Amino acid sequence: MTRLPVRAPEVAAVAVLLALVALYAASPLFAVDLFWHLKLGEVIRDTGAIPRTDLLSAVHPDRPYVQFNWLWEWLVALVVEHFGLRGVRVAQSLVLVGTFALLYRACRRAFGIRTLAFAFSALALVLFEDRFQARPSALVLGFFVLTLPLLLDVETRARRATPWAVAAIAVAWSNLHGGESVLLVLSLGAVLAGEIAHRVWLRRADAAVGRAGLLLAVAVAGLLLSPTLLDGIRHWWTAVVPQIESGNEEWLPSYTMLRNGWRPAFILIALGPTAVAIAYVAEQVRVVRARGRDAIDVREWLLCAGYLVLAHHAVRNAFLCLLPLAFVVRRRAQMWSAAEAAVRRRGAGQVASVAAALLLAISFEDAVLHGYGSLERARTIFASDLAPATYPEFTARFLREAGVEGGILNDGRWGGYLSWLLWPRCGTFVDSRHDLTPEMWPIFLRSHDPLQRPQMMARAFAGYGTELSAFRAPTFPTLRPDPGWHLLFKAGDEEIFQHERGAHAAANVARLRRWLAARGVADAGTLSPDALGEAAAGIGARVWLAAPMQRLKLRDARREQASADAATRVHGLREEGATLWQAGLYAEAARVLARGLVIDPEDAKARHFLALCLFASGDADGARAQIPSLTRLQARLTPVQRGRIAQLARALDAGAR
């Protein structure tokens, strides 16, 4: 470890790094896991007990299920109780700023060169920024930093206080995030195996087998003090395996990040672990050739091999390649002789400074420019605690205000938010834990295909009594519900449908009438179920279009319509029409889309929206007139759009007969 004096440029550079960390970490909440964690935390706070069943489920609330994040959930519930959702953003920012401050400090002492420590921390920001979400896994980098000196240095492991530090880390980690706390045991297990290899294979008298065994035993004991660890890991494993098999992006190999595009941050996440693996192996070959068996450190080999396997295994783990990289950087810095140290350190410092600046720029492009679309949009969005188009804010608010009851077949990303606001009046079919039985998985997967969703809604209602559905529009491909289903509420692309034979159907329709009457709909007591849905959708459209993000989108679209460039005008008209289509203002959307098609009759996407809008607004002949052009232009449509048009054509044909 090297202690360096603090200098003003260093303070300024670290301040920039931590300011960016604070900015990214305080972004509007977008983790789909957050709200079921929060709801479980509220249950723990109110009952004083950790839930042992999947009590939020509409299907199997008595099914055994233990979540291993109970302490994080309880703490976040306390934060929200006293400071609201804004408090979660602030707390997240403080935790991650502290994490990166500790990371820089640890690297500064390990490497002995400020600029190397700064560049290393900047790389960690790029690799870990995707985990800047309000969920327990955001803490893993902090625990990684706390264990970094322990894994890098034999001297640290030999200190008298180290077992106590390991015990504290193990207890805290296992109760905050039991699943990832296993990494501590795996790491210390690798150290113990390495020490045994040093004694048995390399015949080294200084092999600290007993010390390594003590640290591992302390870590295991600390983890087992969690009341949820073993059951939590068992239940998590039964839930995560089907997720992996179904292609959950978080659990795909790191290289699959390139599916999202060849942007700098994606390239680093996708190829960074492989680049570090190549650099580490090359460096080890060089060192062993130069020094022979004396250079072999089996402890380090096992640690780095394990971390590199995990880093390659899943996108979410890419940052774990930082451990082998830390060994490489530290060894390079330590190898320089006193005579060449000044020259080499100056050169390395200059390269590291340029690399750090580039990495910070990459992180800013990814988190702000790409994440929000522009600085102007970032400012607009940042004022809200919830990221736009992430949670069913409008429909959940309606369901709570109206007092609607019943089980919900829902978009899997919405389950947590719906549970937070509506449980126990409403249970959900699924949330992001995916605690599903084998019989539920096909319904869940196929209900997220808009073309198969109506059949899955019918199957879920028949099998599990889920009388409500909550999905992104269009719930039904042609915008008209199947027989038996009635629209309760729509706001933008959020839709709630009620089955007419549901256990709470009559009560929910009565609640909708009262809700509409309270908002000035004079004849709410006499409207038909379909007319009730239309009235509710009209209110929802006004509220949704008044939201900041929609106002910004419409303003940008109308600005494009004033352009001298025809293609830009067409794009602006299509964007405005699509936004009005989302809002459910089909007649108005049709008029806007028709104006764009006058300029470019070959705009297949606009014509697809126009056909759906005409059909939904009752103009079947107008919709039918679009089918020949759409058939000719179908190669320009997405598979889902082609499927919608095929179903629309069948509906039109059935109507003609």
What residues fall within each predicted segment?
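Transmembrane-helix signature of polytopic, membrane-embedded enzymes
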Residues: A15, L103-V126, L141
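Membrane-interface alpha helices of multi-pass inner-membrane proteins
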Residues: V21, A124-F128, T162-G178, S187, ...
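Juxtamembrane membrane-water interface segments that cap and precede transmembrane helices
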Residues: V66-L78, R234-F266
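Transmembrane-helix motifs of polytopic, lipid-linked glycan transferases
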Residues: V90-A110
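Specific aromatic-rich, kink-prone transmembrane helix
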Residues: L102, A124-L127, L139-R157, L188-I196, ...
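Membrane-interface transmembrane helices that cradle and orient dolichyl/undecaprenyl
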Residues: T147-P163, E195, P273-R293
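Short hydrophobic alpha-helices at membrane interfaces in multi-pass membrane enzymes
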Residues: D153-V171, A208-L214, A295-C304
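C-terminal luminal/periplasmic domains and tails of membrane-associated envelope-modifying transferases
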Residues: D366-F429, H434-R657
